């Protein structure tokens, strides 16, 4: 006689197995993803303040950093020469429009979805480029401008007009978001090359339909004065650096002439029996003496200018300035025949550091 399990008990057992298998298959990471998304959203900026009077456009400056090499690597290595040169009174820079996918700009978008990327531009600054007065205004007057440093081989700085935000040396990845109506003043570029990505953030249709208040922007007069003084200081620094480069190139040429004259005099003495013209030797020696006097004068003047540059350049920027000066001197086209003798006496082997 077999053992018979009641039907009700069978159903209970089947139900329990089904319930336990459902527990085993429950997808828990989804909850974690929701939490992660919420955390990422809260980390974002908020450009609108919700008050009893309604939505008010904020006038804060948002400063952060991002990894630009992975996001914008193609723009950093782009050597195309399709920038448009803007060379006006007190303003020199190169600019071109670019298309950037919205997903790469997620870090500068607001958490509430009130603003969207509209236009993007690349701004390139070379040595001496920048603004001594005025600022660059792009985008919607009721929007925001994100300024992202993609590359900086020199000493690059910027000032957000009317605020206390004055950066004397921007690093790669530095990001500043400010009201578009303030503009961005790029300080004069010292050495090297810098590339900035400018992103215009405009109000979305949702925000426009909801409505918002645009308050008057505040103004920091002390910061304006400080920015003006800094601009003049950078202008003087660039002038002295250009003078150092000029002196360096002249020294290269003077050393070259000295080496050639000394070598020529050596052969004159070596073949004294053949070359009997003592006047030629005297002329060569006279030229050598003049060249050495010029070298001594140039070295003295160079030392004076180096002291001036040291007093103007921040200590942490001296290596950047030194590398730029040395590179410019080595790229001098005045001395084409660089043999072993000339190179051993060239300025690149002197202690030319600040």
UniProtKB/Swiss-Prot annotation:
On induction, the UniProt comment says: Expressed in the late phase of the viral replicative cycle.
The function of this protein is:
Stimulates increases in peripheral microtubule dynamics and may increase the motility of the infected cells, contributing to cell-to-cell spread of the virus. Seems to inhibit the signaling via the GTPase RHOA and DIAPH1/mDia.
Query: From which source organism is this entry?
Result: Variola virus (isolate Human/India/Ind3/1967) (VARV)
Q: What is this protein called?
A: Protein OPG055
The record's InterPro entries line, in alphabetical order, gives:
Poxvirus_F11 (IPR007027)
**Keywords assigned:** Late protein
Keyword flag Cytoplasm: no
Q: Name one Pfam family in it.
A: Pox_F11
Q: Per the similarity annotation, which family is this?
A: Belongs to the orthopoxvirus OPG055 family.
Point out the gene that encodes the protein: OPG055
């Amino acid at each position: 006689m077999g053992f018979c399990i009641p039907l009700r008990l069978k159903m209970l057992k089947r139900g329990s197995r089904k319930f336990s298998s459902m527990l085993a298959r429950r997808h828990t990471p989804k909850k974690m993803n929701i939490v992660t998304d919420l955390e990422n959203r809260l980390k974002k900026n908020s450009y609108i303040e919700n008050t009893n009077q309604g939505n008010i456009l904020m006038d804060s400056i948002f400063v952060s950093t991002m990894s630009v090499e992975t996001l914008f690597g193609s723009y950093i290595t782009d050597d195309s020469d399709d920038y448009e040169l803007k060379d006006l009174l007190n303003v020199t820079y190169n600019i071109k429009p670019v298309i950037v996918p919205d997903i790469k700009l997620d870090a500068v978008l607001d958490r509430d979805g009130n603003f969207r990327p509209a236009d993007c531009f690349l701004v390139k600054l070379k040595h001496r480029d920048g603004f001594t007065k005025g600022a660059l205004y792009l985008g919607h007057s009721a929007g925001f401008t994100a300024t992202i440093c993609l590359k900086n081989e020199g000493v690059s700085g910027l000032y957000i007009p009317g605020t206390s935000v004055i950066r004397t040396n921007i690093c790669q990845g530095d990001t500043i978001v400010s009201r578009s109506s303030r503009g961005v003043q790029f300080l004069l570029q010292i050495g090297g090359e810098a590339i900035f990505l400018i992103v215009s953030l405009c109000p979305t249709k949702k925000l426009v339909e909801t409505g918002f208040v645009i308050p008057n922007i505040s103004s920091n007069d002390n910061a304006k004065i400080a920015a003006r003084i800094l601009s003049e200081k950078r202008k003087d620094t660039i002038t002295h650096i250009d003078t150092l480069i000029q002196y360096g190139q002249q020294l290269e040429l003077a050393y070259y002439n000295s080496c050639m004259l000394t070598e020529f005099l050596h052969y004159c003495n070596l073949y004294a029996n053949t070359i009997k013209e003592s006047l030629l030797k005297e002329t060569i020696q006279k030229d050598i003496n003049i060249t050495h006097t010029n070298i001594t004068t140039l070295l003295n003047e160079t030392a004076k200018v180096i002291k001036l540059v040291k007093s103007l350049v921040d200590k942490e920027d001296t290596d950047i300035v030194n590398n730029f000066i040395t590179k410019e001197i080595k790229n001098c086209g005045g001395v084409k025949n660089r043999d072993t003798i000339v190179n051993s006496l060239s300025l690149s082997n002197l202690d030319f550091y600040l």
